[in-house]
Regions:
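Active-site and adjacent substrate-binding regions of carbohydrate-active enzymes
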Residues: 1-183
Length: 183
């Protein structure tokens, strides 16, 4: 598992995020690992916008498995709004995994619910509505620094069970049912 691999290569005057050299290193690691033991799989953890995340498959010569980071916030957004438009649209637009690769679908982790993966999928209004709903349910929001000193929401810190205690209209009696449905 290559954790936060998108930040691997550091170069002055860049964001140090998702640079071409990082992809070269992942390809090199895959070549070395396949030579040593072809049964070993590389999984990349890249909590970045979905399009950039997909780039870690390369041409079938980088990661064998990538975390599907857009799935948790999209399921959450669909469950609390009652609208599956964005989730369905994303699912229908996802390319099939190439031969020898696959997606790791998950709906919760020890980290927060990332918002970067849904940049370009959810509108800013939808993201803000999700943030406000999660704050109402006790969630905290982590932010990242942007150029110029401003901040942008990065992650919602709340358990999935707590996040599903209601809808945008507020808490209700369907938390357990909603939690089971998410699975």
């Amino acid at each position: 598992r290559l954790d936060a691999v998108a930040f691997l290569w550091k170069e002055s005057n860049t964001t140090c995020l998702n640079l071409p050299q990082t992809h070269e290193i992942v390809r090199l690691l895959r070549t070395l690992i396949e030579h040593y033991d072809p049964s070993v799989l590389i999984i990349t953890e890249t909590n970045i916008p979905n399009r950039e995340n997909l780039s870690y498959f390369g041409n079938g010569n980088e990661a064998h498995i990538i975390y599907n980071f857009a799935l948790p916030p999209l399921i959450l957004q669909a469950m609390v709004t009652g609208n599956n438009y964005y989730l369905n649209n994303w699912l229908m637009s996802m390319p099939p995994a190439q031969d020898g690769t696959t997606y790791l679908n998950f709906i919760a982790s020890h980290d927060g619910i990332g918002l970067r993966p849904v940049e370009g999928i959810l509108s800013q209004q939808e993201i803000q509505e999700l943030i406000e709903t999660m704050r109402d349910f006790g969630g905290l929001i982590s932010s990242r620094n942007l150029n110029g000193g401003s901040e942008k929401p990065y992650e919602i810190n709340i358990s999935l069970f707590s996040a599903l205690q209601g809808t945008v209209a507020g808490p209700d009696e369907l938390q357990v049912e909603r939690f089971l449905c998410a699975h």
